[in-house]
Amino acid sequence: MYSHVRDLLFRLNPETSHEFSLDMLGAAERLKLIGLMAAKVPETPVEVMGLRFPNPVGLAAGLDKNGDYFNALGALGFGFVEIGTITPRPQPGNAQPRLFRIPEAKAIINRMGFNNKGVDHLVAQVKKRRYQGILGINIGKNATTPVENAVDDYLTCLRKVYDHADYITVNISSPNTPGLRSLQFGDSLSQLLAPLKKEQGVLQQAGGRYVPIAVKIAPDMDDSEIAQVAGVLLQEGMDGVIATNTTIGREGVEGYDTGKEAGGLSGLPVRDKSTAVIQSLNQCLGGKLPIIGVGGIFDGASAADKVRAGASLVQVYSGFIYEGPALIAAAAAGIASYHQGQ
């Protein structure tokens, strides 16, 4: 069923298709028809970052940047939904075209550039939430904010979303905001995370509620860089790490004209690279910090591979675009089967 709908949607411009699909999902949820599309996912609860997830398969950030559709997306069977990336001020993102599909490679390239309506819009949407599941909010910096002042943007977003999120993700790994990935390296990472950790404590004391903070990292790092990042995450008391974002590499799409487009590559071609990062990261962390695995999950086996490498939870994005809601159940079943076989 979904494959027929997908084939029709894929005839549209990718960004138009994206917006149309979300509008249709939103309408279905309002008309109480969303259950017809939902995956049948058995409850397989897992506790991570002090939160109880009904199943380990979540939706990665980027699909619902503004919090306009998470009620509908959350009704499809996901164990958790992450919205954003959001920035302090609204921004248009990069010029179009900026989203490209490569169906033959089950891949997507995007250079969206954190296009969003701003954190105040997202908070207003979340205040009206009907979705009762785990909601993550992914925060970033505005393109016009100098990298040396990035912490101010992250603090602004942290303060505004804290009371409305179940967990918060610090996105320092998108390749589409100039200079952003530099925050992952050297003293820059500590200088960013230390003030966020301090503010987390202030907000916890003020509101009486602890909201965990995860950091989303890139796949384009060698083992020594991964080890350095892991050390800082532990040193600064982060609660989790999401591995990984899109890659600037082009392995797997070299033969396609669209593969030459600038931006972050996601989907099947990033699967092995992200799994390798998870494995290396897990060795460095020694089980002291939970990992959420994302990148190239298209079935139960690839979801289980992420868990085998060290992930406690997984997220899907490109696989969800290509495979539809059935992927949620398949991924959850693959992970459950892996755990049963241990």
From Swiss-Prot:
Main subcellular localization, coarse class?
Answer: membrane
Amino acids binding substrate: 65, 110-114, 171, 176, 245-246
Taken from the UniProt entry, a GO cellular component term is: cytoplasm
What top-level branch of life does the organism fall under? Bacteria
Per UniProt, the keywords (alphabetical) are:
Cell membrane, Flavoprotein, FMN, Membrane, Oxidoreductase, Pyrimidine biosynthesis
Write down how the cofactor binds this protein.
Binds 1 FMN per subunit.
The way it spans or sits in the membrane comes to: Peripheral membrane protein
Involved pathway(s):
Pyrimidine metabolism; UMP biosynthesis via de novo pathway; orotate from (S)-dihydroorotate (quinone route): step 1/1
Q: Which cofactor does it need?
A: FMN
Q: Which reaction does it catalyse?
A: (S)-dihydroorotate + a quinone = orotate + a quinol
The Gene Ontology terms for molecular function here are: dihydroorotate dehydrogenase (quinone) activity
HAMAP family the record matches: DHO_dh_type2 (MF_00225)
NCBIfam families, alphabetized: PRK05286.1-1 (NF003644), PRK05286.1-2 (NF003645), PRK05286.1-4 (NF003646), PRK05286.2-5 (NF003652), pyrD_sub2 (TIGR01036)
Q: What is this protein's function? A: Catalyzes the conversion of dihydroorotate to orotate with quinone as electron acceptor.
Name the UniProt record assigns to this protein? Dihydroorotate dehydrogenase (quinone)
